[in-house]
Amino acid sequence: MTTMLKGIAASSGVAVAKAYLLVQPDLSFETKTIADTANEEARLDAALATSQSELQLIKDKAVTTLGEEAASVFDAHMMVLADPDMTAQIKAVINDKKVNAESALKEVTDMFIGIFEGMTDNAYMQERAADIKDVTKRVLAHLLGVKLPSPALIDEEVIIVAEDLTPSDTAQLDKKFVKAFVTNIGGRTSHSAIMARTLEIPAVLGTNNITELVSEGQLLAVSGLTGEVILDPSTEQQSEFHKAGDAYAAQKAEWAALKDAETVTADGRHYELAANIGTPKDVEGVNDNGAEAIGLYRTEFLYMDAQDFPTEDDQYEAYKAVLEGMNGKPVVVRTMDIGGDKTLPYFDLPKEMNPFLGWRALRISLSTAGDGMFRTQLRALLRASVHGQLRIMFPMVALVTEFRAAKKIYDEEKSKLIAEGVPVAEGIEVGIMIEIPAAAMLADQFAKEVDFFSIGTNDLIQYTMAADRMNEQVSYLYQPYNPSILRLINNVIKAAHAEGKWAGMCGEMAGDQTAVPLLMGMGLDEFSMSATSVLQTRSLMKRLDSKKMEELSSKALSECATMEEVIALVEEYTK
């Protein structure tokens, strides 16, 4: 009998294949009283070391398949394993209570998980709880001599079905064999969804109970376009899904033909389509997908992948490689955005109740502790500027005085280099990321002093709606098309244009096919997104009329009260 489920369409594509249940092993154990505590400590050390090596191998594979940025999630896992305080506490329980390593590990990690999960208003700490859970499973499996599931060993075409996919699971997926995956939980912004889109594997998440309904080897039909999953599809349904898959493949082939085309609308207006990157290795994907620029280079990954602060020369080489790889096309480099969910093992960040609203990004750069790091990065960028078209962007700016302070340091380092006889490019644009509502509201004043704006919608939306996008209980409030968000964005674009400056966007919204027509109508100049979204967005823009999109955005801004009304209006104008 055919059963149909509906979930969240998290990664586009269609697949029909047998189910592969990714079941976690039984990690239950008995608490034992032991006399030889030294032996238990040695068992713990061995399990930690093996887990560390295993994670490094998984990360190395993930770098190859997903890229440096997506693979950086494993750094957080390895930091948990290397945490001397946690290890010391586990060993203290072994010695004080005379219990086996399994019991001590579970007691200490459960304590940390409970504390972090209790911080319901703090997404960063809740993510750390998820990291500890993933790591605990791995260490416990090694202590028990149990094998964890290994998606890397799959050697036939399957659709993975799981409660959820951990980052380490997703990093092992080979899209030659894994045709899609479906989970009980998760959404479009979860790690597994982001990785699925990077790998271009169809995914449907948040089905609630698919693991209870599916058996190993059962035939499934999955649409990452609509969020539909059919169990035991009929011959007719299989045919419909195959047709939908063929149509999507044909559509992708049409998009690929636009690689070297200009992004021009039906009425001849040009918009710049750019891509976001995390490392120099990502430049190849930018060029392969025909992006006209890099709209966001997240430089913090240079710091997160190092054992100590990267030197000026190390940074110079990285920036030079990116600029040269783009062959004169614009590259917007964001200065380091550490803090929040991005920590460094060699830089002591304070434990804060809410690090996303705390000491991070430019706030660190402008502090006494961060001044040296900031100046080193600016010098490296200025030296590299002669190798391409560099633009520099400061993140997390709330005050005009913050921008002035950062620009003053930039000017000082530029003057020093020139005095030293080091060549520096002329006309480097210096702008800010608009991700704090205060900056969006004061955009008219910022526009008098900056060279450009880049709107970071991921944070702007959650800060404006007072809703943590990782908290499922309030995820309904994370609304990119809410009229309040659209009005803020419009305010920023109009303020930039009033001063003869350009405005771009580098959040997820820039490649959102519902948002793009609205943003076109508002006059957004540059759209920066994941490289794999560039060609689809170019195809959409080429069939739209910019004047008609201006009518659309004007109506949405003046007449709509809800997100649903905005979506209906977009559908009416773009059908």
UniProtKB/Swiss-Prot annotation:
The keyword Ribosomal protein does not apply. GO terms for molecular function: kinase activity; metal ion binding; phosphoenolpyruvate-protein phosphotransferase activity. It catalyses: L-histidyl-[protein] + phosphoenolpyruvate = N(pros)-phospho-L-histidyl-[protein] + pyruvate. Its cofactor is Mg(2+). One of its GO terms (cellular component) is cytoplasm. The reaction takes place in three steps, mediated by a phosphocarrier histidine residue located on the surface of the central domain. The two first partial reactions are catalyzed at an active site located on the N-terminal domain, and the third partial reaction is catalyzed at an active site located on the C-terminal domain. For catalytic turnover, the central domain swivels from the concave surface of the N-terminal domain to that of the C-terminal domain. Phosphoenolpyruvate binds at R298, R334, N458, D459, R469. This is Phosphoenolpyruvate-protein phosphotransferase. Its main location: cytoplasm. It comes from Lactococcus lactis subsp. cremoris (Streptococcus cremoris). It is found in: Cytoplasm.
